[in-house]
Amino acid sequence: MGKGLALDIGGTKIAAAVVTESGMLIGRQQIATPRGGAGQLAAALETLIAPYRHQVDFIAVASTGIISGGRLTALNPANLGGLADFPLYDCIRSISDLPCVLLNDGQAAAWAEYQALGDKNDNMMFVTVSTGVGGGIILNKKLLVGQRGLAGHIGHTLSDPHGVLCGCGRRGCVESVASGTAIGAETLGWKQPVSAATVFDMAQQGDAQAGKVINRSAAAIAQMLADMKMALDLEVVILGGSVGLAVGYLERVVAAQKTLPGIYRVPVQEAHHRQDSGLLGAALWARTSL
């Protein structure tokens, strides 16, 4: 099929790269995800797509949110600056008439990471801990998308029934406890609130308060993995996202798993493709779909 342009729309950034037939990413770039509504998102997509209209054969998009019927619907609109619904396919087709395939970003990343594992596993899951918490599931060697595109929205499984209200409208979702947004929100009661990135820096320097906040996130992820292992008989979990790939986070998740009975534990490893799993996965999926 030749080269494709892959896009990865996240809550914090939109990344783009040309993906060759051999799976190499060329000219990777990223911009901040606009927070000003549909018009700004459309303009950002045009900025990234327009220069490549005559250089690639297809467009592949991995995006946060529910991807169904060509639309992006946000379970937690706060992750996209309040944008709840966006005609993603129509927007891209208005910029370019190239063939276009859309997929949820967690699903796309799961597909790329599954390919990287080789043919060793039947059931695996990709987990992204970033602005929000999401994922993608491979079951019996097949990517689980779902009739409505919901499969893999593991950040909206329950962590604490008495917890804070999640942006999706339910109380105590994993995302409201474990995400980068939640980590930052935990510092609002501090003398000087800081970002999630700063919390990790503080923890690296031995700050006990910062370490406690990160441990709470890691424990929520470990409990969620235990639930998903029991539901899906997972063989391995791949961890990604800005929080998931932060120094020391994987080790904290593994430590939290060790407090559970052995049957609830599942091997966890960092994403092979790091921050590019979504880009590559979208392109790989498009090649199977077009």
Swiss-Prot record:
Position of the signal peptide: none
GO molecular function, one term: ATP binding
EC number(s) reported in the record: 2.7.1.60
Residues holding Zn(2+): H156, C166, C168, C173
Keyword check for Nuclease: no
HAMAP family noted in UniProt: ManNAc_kinase
Family assignment from sequence similarity: Belongs to the ROK (NagC/XylR) family. NanK subfamily.
Protein name (database record): N-acetylmannosamine kinase
Native source organism of the sequence: Yersinia pestis
